[in-house]
Structures are given as C-alpha cells and as structure tokens.
C-alpha cells in the first residue's frame, strides 16, 4: 500500500487483522520482508516524545483490545529523526527505536549527545523512567531553559543519568 508520498508498506492480513509486515516512513519503498510481526522503519523530520506518549495513552484508552492486539504484533518501530524533542530538549539526527515490553513501552534513543532509554509503564500511576547512559548539553546565553516551568506542567518522571557532560565538563 501507499497512502502518501511518505508512507508505504506491505502487510499480511487475516480476518481484517494485521498479522505482520513492514510499514515504511519516508521516500523509499519497503523491501520484501518477513510477515511474522509488524515492523515500522524509515525516517522523519520531527518526533516529540511527549506526543508519542500522549498518542500511546490515547490509543490504549480507546480500545484496550485493539491496543493489546497491536502490541502483540509489533516487533519494533525504528526511525531516523531529523529533530527529536524530549522534555524540551532537542537532539538532531537521532535514531529512535520503540518496542512494546510486557508492562511498558520502551523508547531507545541514540544520538551524538544522548544515549538512553525512556520507559512508559502501562500503569498510569507509575512515573515515566528516563534511563540515560550519556547526555551532553551545551548551555546557551538565554538563561535557565526551565524558568517558568511549574511542577504541574510536568509528567511524573524518574531520571537516572550515568554520564552528564555540560559545556565539555564531565559531571
């Protein structure tokens, strides 16, 4: 199938349900692949982590049965992102991989400035987990980027940073 210039795919269906296949984002068409699970690959100019989280929560709220079936069939989403925004920070030319685990969604991010994982639990009372192996930030002259942000504006999150580099200084 080809929906637009930037979305195409090959899917195997049974009784109106997706069994497997490949969905391709971007200008290249999908190559023949396995149909044992659903895979999404490609590239896009922009992804916002908050939008992904909101989409998953809304999707699961609409139909738990459809969400469970999708989750069971999904092997992975692997996309190259021009600009990846995560909680107000922007990263350029990132690799993003999304998988469904037993009780949470997993977002793996690899970038020159960031390497880590965000875990979104199925339990809405469980905070989002950000497990950061490496984070390199450069300060700017604009002051505190979080000035004016209130705690009620943020989702509950647990952050574990193993290596933080700020302006070339390793903390």
State the predicted function of each range:
Residues 1-171:
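Membrane-proximal interfacial segments on either side of biological membranes
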């Amino acid at each position: 199938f080809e929906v637009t210039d930037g979305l195409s795919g090959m899917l195997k269906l049974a009784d109106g349900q997706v069994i497997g296949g490949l969905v391709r984002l971007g200008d290249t068409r999908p190559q023949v692949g396995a149909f044992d699970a659903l895979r999404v690959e490609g590239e896009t100019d922009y992804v916002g982590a908050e939008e992904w989280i909101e989409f998953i929560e809304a999707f699961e709220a609409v139909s738990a049965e459809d969400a469970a079936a999708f989750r069971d069939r999904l092997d992975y989403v692997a996309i190259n992102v021009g600009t990846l925004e995560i909680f107000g920070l922007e990263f350029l030319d990132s690799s993003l991989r999304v998988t469904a685990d037993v009780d949470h969604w997993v977002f793996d991010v690899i970038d020159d400035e960031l390497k880590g994982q965000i875990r979104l639990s199925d339990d809405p009372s469980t905070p989002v987990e950000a497990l950061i192996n490496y984070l390199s930030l450069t300060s700017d002259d604009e002051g505190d980027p979080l000035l004016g942000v209130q705690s009620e504006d943020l989702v509950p999150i647990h952050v574990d940073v193993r290596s933080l580099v700020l302006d070339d200084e390793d903390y």
